């Protein structure tokens, strides 16, 4: 009981401290998935991280040369992008591992001593730490409308043999800043906006705490 109380107290103090910290904005350059990639939010978000770190490479180049793709049927988004991000009707999504590996393929091919990391499972305070102390933006998996996750009737089987439903409103955004109880995100469809910290935390956790950093 004492341990539970101590952990709750730490969380409360951390949240209160977050509401008091000054605003930190990283000034990530906005990139948009449309018109060329109506289902390419993940690679567009990665493109923003690449440009922030000084690599002048386009989302199209990253997608065409380094992003692993899978077919449309029973494909696992943990291993590759399902379908074609250039297509409105035949493009779905991928999770963090293929996006991190896409960047790492680019780094290896060009002898660049950088590493992209799949940070799936990172706490929301880990996301804040990346922004405030490391001064690095974070790609996170979110929803396209800021509403709770919704699912298609279709599913896939993961590497553990578990059947998982496919999201119908999955989206990818870049966390660009924090402060005063708000989180600044750059949406590849809508551009930059601020969302309430509690709302951001709730959706981030509902979407599996998926994240990529460089």
Predicted regions and their residues:
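Active-site-adjacent structural segments surrounding the nucleophilic cysteine of cysteine proteases
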Residues: 2-101, 144-146, 152-166
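Loop/turn elements at helix/coil->beta-strand transitions in domains of secreted/extracellular proteins
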Residues: 110-112, 134-139, 179-182, 209
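Extracytoplasmic
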Residues: 36, 134-135, 168-170
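Structural recognition of the beta-strand scaffold that forms the well-ordered cores
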Residues: 40, 137-142, 174, 184-186
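Mid-length scaffold segments of soluble, non-membrane domains
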Residues: 87-126, 130-133
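Short, solvent-exposed, low-complexity loop/linker segments
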Residues: 128-138, 142-150
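Active-site-proximal beta-strand/loop segments in catalytic clefts of secreted hydrolases
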Residues: 46, 65, 119, 141-145, ...
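Noncatalytic regulatory segments and standalone regulatory/sensor domains
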Residues: 148, 152-167, 173-214
């Amino acid at each position: 009981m004492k341990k539970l109380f101590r952990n709750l107290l730490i969380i409360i103090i951390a949240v209160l401290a977050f509401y008091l910290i000054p605003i930190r904005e990283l000034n990530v350059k906005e990139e948009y998935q449309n018109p060329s990639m109506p289902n390419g939010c993940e690679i567009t978000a990665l493109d923003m991280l690449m440009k922030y770190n000084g690599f002048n490479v386009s989302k199209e180049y990253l997608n065409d040369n380094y992003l692993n793709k899978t077919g449309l049927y029973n494909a696992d988004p943990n291993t590759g992008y399902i379908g074609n991000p250039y297509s409105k009707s035949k493009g779905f999504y991928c999770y963090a591992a293929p996006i991190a590996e896409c960047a790492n393929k680019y780094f290896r091919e060009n002898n660049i001593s950088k590493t992209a990391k799949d940070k799936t499972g990172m706490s929301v305070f880990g996301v804040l730490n990346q922004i405030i102390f490391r001064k690095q933006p974070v790609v996170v998996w979110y929803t396209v409308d800021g509403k709770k996750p919704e699912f298609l009737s279709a599913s896939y089987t993961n590497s553990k043999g578990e059947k998982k439903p496919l999201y119908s409103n999955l989206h990818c955004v870049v966390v660009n800043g924090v402060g005063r109880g708000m989180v600044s995100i750059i949406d590849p469809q809508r551009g930059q906006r601020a969302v309430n910290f509690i709302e951001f935390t709730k959706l981030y956790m509902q979407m599996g705490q998926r994240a990529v950093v460089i």
